[in-house]
Amino acid sequence: MFKHVTVLLEETVDGLDIKPNGTYVDCTLGGGGHSSYLLSQLTEGGKLIAFDQDEIAIQNAKDKFSSYGEQFIAVKSNFRYLSEKLHELGITEVDGILFDLGVSSPQLDTPERGFSYHHDAPLDMRMDQEAPLTAYDVVNNWSYEQLVRIFFQYGEEKFSKQIARKIEAYREKKKIETTGELVELIKEGIPAPARRTGGHPAKRVFQAIRIAVNDELKVFEEALEAAIEIVKPGGRISVITFHSLEDRICKTTFKRNSTTPELPPGLPIIPEEFKPKLKLITRKPILPSDVELEENNRARSAKLRIAEKR
């Protein structure tokens, strides 16, 4: 069963300031938590289009929301194709868009998907199981320098070089086939005192490989820019991030689009192309409450930012 505890549920959807007859997009359907709450606030004229690249998530949502008929449309696609897929549906503007950038718990908890360092499984980590690049390819074929870069940039791993050296030495003798093998190599690359602090020693490297396999940061950056263009004036965008790099992309994109650039003094009016596109609804990110953190440990790194189209 596709179960998933939704993070910052009400804050994210209520932050969109739902119009009951509006058209909305959930870019990250997952277990359907945000979609379910959003659909419950729509009248017959309202519509929700939900994206996911996971076939199981799509089928689950079609069953779960079948009573909504044509009000709910599930699109099996990466949200990097947000504009194209909406245009195919004849939709050129919407009233609100939400992103929840966490990996859905069913993906983490399904051992054979290879996302988890708690289960031994083939090295996969693809959110779209038809995509060509896998974690196996990254771990076995990428150069030492490439591995160091992603471990450091995407995982903020202090021992990136040591871990990459262990991987490089091991794969000269034998291909690294499973998550279990990779976990052991990561542990060998981290000094014993450091292994005992800061959660599971493989956490940061697994995150880095997952981001690389799915090209997550570039995809999000492009999709957020597209969302700003698609949302109507007065419409809103809600974004939940779980990683400092994702949050930085969201923060800087929102800030850049909500401020007026420095213009030559004495201009009688601000040219239209220089007027800010957005108004920030959240100056600082909204964080999960203590109650939510007690109920769902995976929410601990979540941050919610909301902006409104001018």
UniProtKB/Swiss-Prot annotation:
**Top-level taxon in the UniProt lineage:** Bacteria
Q: Binding of S-adenosyl-L-methionine: at which residues?
A: G32, G33, H34, D52, F79, D100, Q107
Coiled-coil parts of chain? none
Matches recorded under Gene3D superfamilies = Putative methyltransferase TM0872, insert domain (1.10.150.170), Vaccinia Virus protein VP39 (3.40.50.150)
User: Which Pfam families would you find in this protein's record?
Assistant: Methyltransf_5 (PF01795)
**GO cellular component term of the entry, any:** cytoplasm
EC number of this enzyme:
2.1.1.199
User: Could you tell me what this protein does?
Assistant: Specifically methylates the N4 position of cytidine in position 1402 (C1402) of 16S rRNA.
Q: What is the name listed in the Swiss-Prot or TrEMBL entry for this protein?
A: Ribosomal RNA small subunit methyltransferase H
This protein's species is Bacillus cytotoxicus (strain DSM 22905 / CIP 110041 / 391-98 / NVH 391-98)
